[in-house]
UniProtKB/Swiss-Prot annotation:
NCBIfam families: proB (TIGR01027). GO terms for cellular component: cytosol. The gene is proB. This is Glutamate 5-kinase. Belongs to the glutamate 5-kinase family. Residues 275-355 form the PUA domain. Substrate binds at residues 49, 136, 148. Catalyzes the transfer of a phosphate group to glutamate to form L-glutamate 5-phosphate. It is found in: Cytoplasm. Its EC number is 2.7.2.11. It comes from the Bacteria. Keywords: Amino-acid biosynthesis, ATP-binding, Cytoplasm, Kinase, Nucleotide-binding, Proline biosynthesis, Transferase.
């Protein structure tokens, strides 16, 4: 079995009727495929949108609401209804499911990140299928485009999945918008996610949910940089999930980095909040980015910000202004300032094990398009 542990992300458009309401037949089809894969020995996680779609009708809205408060209220009602649909269908096959609601804070806070990882590991080891969604009833910023796309990639990276599958109404990444450009061709295999790929993604995608192709590609960067390959395919086939697991479904496959980031490095790269900035000279910049060395105090030109021992800072090349990466400091700002002022600073500010270099691919995640 090539892909033992698989994370599936199902978008709103793959779960709803034409009027935007939840399609119980589509949910049933998804759970049947999950059951078949589970019985075949796969470990599965489902990141599911659809809470708003499941709840807005029950609150008397005639169509999917657009105001944040109305969305949150609909999600609060719909989350339970959606989970009930999944749970009922899976129990018919004697499969236990578990609801997990996450927010970005669960990834930013290292303690909560570790707790979430441990809970998911126990569930998978006990044969349950975790069903995950953004906690839409309490968050605001996370309701923006791409919430569950990014969430699924973060979860896949956290549990070191063997594959992340995006099920959507577009069967992969195209060179243009396939709905308006007859010359658009699907890319079947993407080795590296670069600016060209990002530009292609900006012109294609679904308009029904809160996710689009661009957010899926940026989410795929998180997964592939963490060693998890990604597959984007259509959910329109009745056996699309099974075909994706067997690599027989038409779609776009994103190759994972051979040496993916492990949990500690993932946290540093994608979630750790920087508390200050450090500028270094040319020699220190080369030592960090080219030779995998620790950051010595002797290479620091200046520091900015209020940070303490153990905090995360961003390091810049003073000459070029380029961001080199992030790391955990061994000294607070005040102590560092005193040592730099003495002009005889010796020792290490950031050890290599507490450092992550920002690659061009990772940098794209923090670029507005």
């Amino acid at each position: 079995m090539k892909y033992k542990r698989i994370v599936f992300k199902v978008g709103t458009s793959s779960l709803t009727n034409e009027d935007g309401s939840l399609s119980r037949s589509k949910v049933k089809d998804i759970t049947q495929q999950l059951a078949m894969l589970h019985e075949a020995g796969h470990e599965l996680i489902l990141v599911s949108s659809g809470a708003i779609a499941a709840g807005f009708g029950a609150l008397g809205f005639k169509k999917r609401p657009t105001k944040i408060a109305d969305k949150q209220a609909s999600a609060a009602v719909g989350q339970g209804l959606l989970l009930e649909e999944y749970t009922t269908n899976l129990l018919l096959r004697q499969i236990v499911s578990a609801q997990i609601l996450l927010t970005q804070d669960d990834f930013v806070d290292k303690r909560r990140y570790k707790n979430a990882h441990q809970a998911l590991s126990v569930l998978l080891n006990r044969g349950a299928i975790p069903i995950i969604n953004e906690n839409d009833s309490v968050v605001i910023d996370e309701l923006k485009v791409g919430d569950n796309d990014t969430l699924s990639a973060q979860v896949a990276a956290m549990v070191q999945a063997d594959l992340l599958v995006f099920l959507t109404d577009v069967d992969g990444l195209y060179t243009g918008n396939p709905n308006s450009d007859p010359r658009a061709k699907r890319l079947e295999r993407i080795e590296t996610i670069n600016r060209e790929i990002i530009d292609m993604a900006g012109g294609a995608g679904s308009s029904n949910g809160t996710g689009g192709m661009l957010t899926k590609i940026k989410a795929a960067t998180i997964a592939t940089e963490s060693g998890v390959p990604v597959y984007i395919c259509s959910s329109l086939k009745s056996d699309s999930m099974i075909e994706a697991a067997e690599e027989t479904e038409d779609g776009s496959y994103f190759v994972a980095q051979e040496k993916g980031l492990r949990t500690q490095k993932q946290w540093l790269a994608f979630y750790a909040q920087s508390q200050g900035s450090i500028w270094v000279d040319k020699g220190a910049a080369e030592a960090l980015s080219q030779y995998g060395k620790s950051l010595l105090l002797s290479g620091i030109v200046e520091a900015e910000g209020v940070f303490s021992y153990g905090d995360i800072v961003t390091v810049f090349d003073k000459e070029s202004g380029k961001s080199l990466g992030k790391g955990r400091v061994q000294f607070g700002a005040s102590a560092l300032e005193d040592m730099l002022r003495s002009q005889k600073a010796k020792g290490v500010l950031i050890y290599r094990d507490d450092w992550i270099s920002i690659t061009p691919e990772i940098q794209l995640l923090f670029t507005e398009f």
